[in-house]
Amino acid sequence: MEDLEEENFTLSVSSPKDAEFDSVVGHMEDIIMDDEFQLLQHGFMDKYYHEFEDTEENKLTYTTIFNEYIGLVEKFIEEQLLLRIPAFNMSAFISSLQCHREEIAGDIFDILLTFTDFLAFKEMFLDYKAEKEGRTVDLSCGLVVTPLIGSSVSSSS
């Protein structure tokens, strides 16, 4: 007789709170990738990117811009989430972020971080400013693609 290997299957059951959190994150991904959000965020950054300088010192105007950004972007995301999840509570979601920090996709986490972390907000503006001023590194110029296996091309013309 054949020896049958025993297979173990593990069923992962998440709590209702975890499922709710995952649902909110999924909706946030949709909102952030949507053209309406992209236009809102880029329009705001276009308006203020020239104010930011890459120095240790932070201008007082940064605080005003930061507070305006939080009001505009957080409000937009919250309104969009309420349309999708009528019982959504932003305060409860933000407090549950610490428990799920490792589970959140990079883009979502970066956006959320700009609501609470001023340095992340400033870095976002400095990156945007560098891009607008053409100071980003374009790696495509120096890339050369060569085959790993030498191909023999016969030149029998």
UniProtKB/Swiss-Prot annotation:
Record keywords: Cell projection, Cilium, Cytoplasm, Cytoskeleton, Mitochondrion, Nucleus
Family: Belongs to the ARL2BP family.
Compartment(s) where it occurs, according to its Swiss-Prot or TrEMBL record: Cytoplasm; Mitochondrion intermembrane space; Cytoplasm, Cytoskeleton, Microtubule organizing center, Centrosome; Nucleus
InterPro entries per the UniProt record, alphabetical: ARL2BP, BART_dom, BART_sf
Main location: cytoplasm
Role of this protein: Plays a role as an effector of the ADP-ribosylation factor-like protein 2, ARL2.
Classification via Pfam families: ARL2_Bind_BART (PF11527)
Originating gene: arl2bp
A cellular component annotation (GO) from this entry: spindle
Protein's name according to its UniProt entry: ADP-ribosylation factor-like protein 2-binding protein
Biological classification of the source: Eukaryota, Metazoa, Chordata, Craniata, Vertebrata
PANTHER family xrefs: ADP-RIBOSYLATION FACTOR-LIKE PROTEIN 2-BINDING PROTEIN
UniProt organism field: Xenopus tropicalis (Western clawed frog)
